[in-house]
Design a protein with these regions (language model features):
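Rossmann-fold NAD(P)-dependent oxidoreductase module
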Residues: 16, 20, 83, 134
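Catalytic helix-loop patch of NAD(P)-dependent Rossmann-fold dehydrogenases
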Residues: 64-67, 71-78, 102, 106-147
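SDR active-site strand-loop-helix element
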Residues: 7, 50-54, 94-100, 148-150
Length: 153
């Protein structure tokens, strides 16, 4: 059975992943913005896959506390990538939950292509775009990854 490391397992999406996917899970339960905590969890556990769902999501909360959102969404993701860089036994695959907010979309224009240039209109989209840039660094480590841009209007 595959072992899957997961962040954000207490959120709406995380709970569904735990209920649905047939893996043994290693859940991160700490401060994603704290590199030492992230590194300890990554080094303490052996896993085949990593699903990164932890995020500060409600756009109103991101607007009201941008600094905290940036720490969770961007720095938290950077911490995962940096810890994986140091880990000898790397996962086969990483999934990162991003958002449609990385595109320049509005309620009138909801049709887009994944090839469209990233141009976030919101602070939330900005934090997730920065996080996506961190995830793309996994390619240099020969780790396969998928960035899932979840649409919600």
């Amino acid at each position: 059975m595959k072992i899957c490391a997961i962040t954000g397992s207490t959120g709406i999406l995380g709970k569904r992943v735990l209920e649905t996917l047939p893996f043994k899970f290693s859940k991160f339960r700490g401060n994603i913005a704290n590199f030492k905590e992230v590194k300890h969890w990554i080094f303490k556990n052996e896993f085949d896959l990593l699903i990164h769902l932890a995020a500060k999501v409600p756009t109103k909360q991101v607007q009201s506390n941008f600094k905290k959102a940036l720490k969770i969404n961007h720095i938290g993701t950077k911490n995962i990538v940096e810890a994986l860089k140091l880990k000898k036994n790397k996962p086969e695959w990483v999934f990162f939950a991003s958002t449609s907010h990385v595109y320049k979309l509005n309620h009138k224009k909801v049709k887009t292509s994944e090839k469209e240039k990233l141009n976030p209109l919101s602070k939330y989209g900005f934090t997730k775009k920065k996080a996506e840039n961190e995830i793309m660094r996994l390619k240099n480590m020969k780790i396969k990854y998928c960035i899932g841009r979840i649409f919600s209007f």
